[in-house]
Amino acid sequence: MNDLKPILFPGMEPRRPLVIAGPCSAETEEQVLRTARELAAEGVRIYRAGLWKPRTLPGGFEGVGAEGLAWLRRVKRETGMYTATEVATHEHVTAALAGGVDLLWIGARTAANPFA
């Protein structure tokens, strides 16, 4: 564990803990922007929001999908925060990167069963 490197983006100080915060699920543009503004006012620099939601059982809300990418771009533009979202497929990765998302992660459910 001696080879750990800090996770930094331009303009961020190397401090601990690194706080990444935001809603588990992006549901509306208003919710995303309101939450981002409140978190930015508290000094959070990385905003996370789930756009694609893996579910154990089919038929539940699976997220707003690519529609939410415009919301994250607006978060970045209006607050200066970096943005992050969970991805599960090659299509998600391609869309998120094309949409300007700064940080991607693969969740536990996805690692076990990628939106099967």
Regions found by a protein language model. Give the residues of each.
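N-terminal amphipathic alpha-helix/helix-capping segment at the start of soluble metabolic enzymes
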Residues: 1-20
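Long, contiguous binding/interaction regions
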Residues: 2-3, 21, 27, 36, ...
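Active-site-adjacent beta->alpha loops and helix N-cap segments on the catalytic face
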Residues: 3-6, 29-31, 56-72, 89-94, ...
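Solvent-exposed alpha-helices and their adjacent loops that cap or buttress functional pockets
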Residues: 10-14, 74-77, 95-98
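Nucleotide/phosphate-binding sheet-loop regions of phosphoryl- and nucleotidyl-transfer enzymes
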Residues: 11-17, 28-34, 52-57
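Hydrophobic faces of well-ordered beta-strands that scaffold small-molecule active sites
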Residues: 18-23, 45-49, 83-85, 104-106
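Glycine-enriched alpha-helix->loop->beta-strand junction motifs that scaffold or abut catalytic
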Residues: 43, 95-105
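Glycine-rich phosphate-binding "P-loop"
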Residues: 51-62, 77-83, 104
